[in-house]
Amino acid sequence: MYGIEYTTVLTFLISLILLNYILKSLTRMMDFIIYRFLFIVVILSPLLKAQNYGINLPITGSMDTAYANSTQEETFLTSTLCLYYPTEAATEINDNSWKDTLSQLFLTKGWPTGSVYFKEYTDIASFSVDPQLYCDYNVVLMKYDATLQLDMSELADLILNEWLCNPMDITLYYYQQTDEANKWISMGSSCTIKVCPLNTQTLGIGCLTTDTATFEEVATAEKLVITDVVDGVNHKLDVTTATCTIRNCKKLGPRENVAVIQVGGSDVLDITADPTTAPQTERMMRINWKKWWQVFYTVVDYVNQIIQAMSKRSRSLNSAAFYYRI
């Protein structure tokens, strides 16, 4: 009788131990499955775009405007914007808190405080030497000046494109441009450029290599010059080296994260006629300009439309950078 009771108790204990082992095994198996599933989700989530079935609200949190359901890439939430302006803008506004005001206005367009940087430059000449286009998106405001029309046009060509440049020693060497993308870029306080094309015997064509007065003058007292001559022909150059430097440059393609906005002026500067601008796309906007506050209000109002036409830190050769005018 006691043997049967001991057997029953022993059987119960063995069953309890076996059940405990089975439960632990199931727990370990479920943990493995769950962790493996979560690992796969984490790996694949950056590669997938899911449909958003919620309501997208403006960053200000306003409930006044609801946008259609969609999966959107909110560029401004992870990007920086640099706004370059001439010194005269800050002088005219004459308000120590004007940048803070604009930052709050950019916030209403979805650009968080701290993502927009305001960079001042003295004049076109100093800006062209060292543009410092450091942000993901760069918008340059250029006040139209009839006396600097050529410099403005060439500055736009300079900063809207990527260039690879090397120094030139015009005292020792002749130079030729190999193709349409090859230009000579000169910068300085006053650049006067003269050229003398040479034949195969290195004799001047319509000029004397020993007399710079017979050279053909292609630029006079400009601050920025992009010189284009006949390809495949050697040239002897004369440059005002005391006030100007010249470089042999190759246009690599559009700098798609830069926009130039012309402020005011009756003439529209156009750089798309250059055969090296491919595709020849011109995008412009214009408002009646009176004061710098009006200019900045317009930029804030249209900033997202401008950004949509640009590419973030891109050097793609497939689409052109653009030139805006207000």
From Swiss-Prot:
Gene3D superfamilies: Glycoprotein VP7, domain 1, Rotavirus outer-layer protein VP7, domain 2
Chain sites annotated for binding Ca(2+) 1: 95, 206, 214, 216
Region (GPR motif): 253-255
Positions annotated with a glycan in the UniProt record: 69
Modifications made to the protein after synthesis: N-glycosylated.
InterPro entries, per database record: VP7, VP7_1, VP7_2
Record note on quaternary structure: Homotrimer; disulfide-linked. 2 Ca(2+) ions bound at each subunit interface in the trimer hold the trimer together. Interacts with the intermediate capsid protein VP6. Interacts with the outer capsid protein VP5*. Interacts with host integrin heterodimer ITGAV/ITGB3.
Key word Isomerase present: no
Note: Some rotavirus strains are neuraminidase-sensitive and require sialic acid to attach to the cell surface. Some rotavirus strains are integrin-dependent. Some rotavirus strains depend on ganglioside for their entry into the host cell. Hsp70 also seems to be involved in the entry of some strains. In group A rotaviruses, VP7 defines the G serotype.
Region (LVD motif): 237-239
GO CC aspect terms: host cell endoplasmic reticulum lumen; T=13 icosahedral viral capsid; viral outer capsid
Similarity field: Belongs to the rotavirus VP7 family.
Functional note: Calcium-binding protein that interacts with rotavirus cell receptors once the initial attachment by VP4 has been achieved. Rotavirus attachment and entry into the host cell probably involves multiple sequential contacts between the outer capsid proteins VP4 and VP7, and the cell receptors. Following entry into the host cell, low intracellular or intravesicular Ca(2+) concentration probably causes the calcium-stabilized VP7 trimers to dissociate from the virion. This step is probably necessary for the membrane-disrupting entry step and the release of VP4, which is locked onto the virion by VP7.
Annotated S-S bridges: 82-135, 165-249, 191-244, 196-207
Ranges for region CNP motif: 165-167
UniProt-annotated binding residues for Ca(2+) 2: 177, 228-229, 231, 301
Record's protein name: Outer capsid glycoprotein VP7
Residues spanning the signal sequence: 1-50
Localization annotation: Virion; Host endoplasmic reticulum lumen
Alphabetic keyword roster: Calcium, Capsid protein, Disulfide bond, Glycoprotein, Host endoplasmic reticulum, Host-virus interaction, Metal-binding, Outer capsid protein, Signal, T=13 icosahedral capsid protein, Virion
Lineage top rank: taxon: Viruses
Example GO BP: receptor-mediated virion attachment to host cell
Molecular functions (GO terms): metal ion binding
A Pfam family of this chain: VP7
Source lineage: Viruses, Riboviria, Orthornavirae, Duplornaviricota, Resentoviricetes
